[in-house]
Structures are given as structure tokens and as C-alpha cells.
From Swiss-Prot:
Glycosylated. Residues 1-27 form the signal peptide. Disulfide bonds join C65-C87, C68-C76. Its main location: secreted. Expressed exclusively in endosperm. Found in basal endosperm transfer cells. Regulates maternal nutrient uptake, sucrose partitioning, and seed biomass yield. Necessary and sufficient for the establishment and differentiation of the endosperm nutrient transfer cells located at the mother:seed interface. Exclusive expression of the maternal allele at the early stages of endosperm development. The maternal allele is hypomethylated. At later stages, expression becomes biallelic. Regulated by the transcription factor MRP1. Glycans are attached at N36. The lineage of its organism: Eukaryota, Viridiplantae, Streptophyta, Embryophyta, Tracheophyta. It comes from the Eukaryota. Pfam families: Meg. Keywords: Cell membrane, Cell wall, Developmental protein, Disulfide bond, Extracellular matrix, Glycoprotein, Membrane, Secreted, Signal. InterPro entries: Meg (IPR056205). It comes from Zea mays. This is Protein MATERNALLY EXPRESSED GENE 1.
């Protein structure tokens, strides 16, 4: 009787683990970049850790001196406010 409970538990946890990996693999196939929409978690990470607006070297190309680094875009802008709005 004890052996049957262990086998049942092993089968249950194996199926649970298989379901987890199947759901995880299915979630990795879902890409939101095709429509230029970032996931909220990704946006929060970019805002806190990597994204920043930096002033480029003078003279700036087309007077766009503030460049987004590591954010949603990698473009340069006329003002820091424009850069921050586009980058974060």
C-alpha cells in the first residue's frame, strides 16, 4: 500500500512538472516586440537598471544631443525630456 502512494505521488509531481515546462515553453513563444509593446515587467527592469538618457559628444548630429541608451529606443532627441519620454 505504501509503495502505491509513492508511485501516485511520483506520477502526480511528474505531470505537474511537465505541465509547468509546457506552459513555460508556450510562454517563451509569445513575442510582443512585433507590435512594439513591452511587457510591464520588462519595462520596469529597463527603467530601474539599464535605460538612461545621455548627452552625446558635441557637436551633436542634427542638434539631437540626448540619446537613449538601453531603453525602448536607441534614437537621439533634441531635449532631455523628449529622450526620457521615448526611452522609458
Amino acid at each position: 500500500m505504501e509503495y502505491k502512494k509513492r508511485v501516485d505521488a511520483l506520477v502526480f509531481f511528474s505531470l505537474l512538472l511537465l505541465g509547468y515546462f509546457a506552459a513555460h515553453a508556450h510562454g517563451n513563444g509569445h513575442v510582443t516586440d512585433d507590435v512594439n509593446v513591452s511587457a510591464p515587467a520588462e519595462e520596469g527592469i529597463l527603467r530601474e537598471k539599464r535605460a538612461q538618457c545621455a548627452q552625446g559628444f558635441l557637436p551633436c548630429k542634427d542638434n539631437k544631443c540626448y540619446c537613449c541608451i538601453g531603453g525602448r529606443t536607441h534614437d537621439c532627441y533634441y531635449t532631455m525630456a523628449q529622450c526620457s519620454h521615448a526611452c522609458f
